[in-house]
Amino acid sequence: MVNSNIEIKALGEANLLDNNDKLITPAKLREVFGSMLNHLGGNLYFTNAGGGLTVPAATETKLIGDFNTTGYKVTEYRPWYVDADYIVGANSTVQLRDFKMASFVSFRFEVGLTVPSNTEVQILARVKNSLGQKVFDINVEDLVFKSAATRTKTSNFFFFMDSDIENGTLEIYVQSDNEIQATWQSFLIDAR
């Protein structure tokens, strides 16, 4: 894993025995995944939010955070758009400018959740056009908590850039059947 700043630990080593022909081993898996991670690029942002946002029951609520607008370089391989500014002001809206048409846009984010027992939480991504009109929603997560919990949920989704959403925006929303606390902690955005 030359030049990787992400350490791969174990990766199933306890549960994966060498197969008969010795072509797939835990060490080989670590090497392959390490190589994949080395070639992932993107801009990683962390929020400076001090506490959770209260999400009222049965109310779709936009997640907000005081984001540091300087992207952190995830690996040594930086994508072509690395100097673009994807967060504007304090409105926590990801700007979809500077993306080439038909590019594959991947998005990874973390949301801290504090929920009571017997709670369903939905997380969705809303993509709007340059006029601020909704073009589509992506139902990213539908979680059911049988018992009260405080945890960080990491989610991934992707879409393809199209002229309908050129210079548009992306926002993250949370909805729950009970009042919860939600904190948008970080996001990673990349395009190929």
Q: Where does each model-flagged region fall?
A:
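Extracellular jelly-roll beta-sandwich "head" domains, especially the C-terminal globular C1q domain
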Residues: 24-30, 38-192
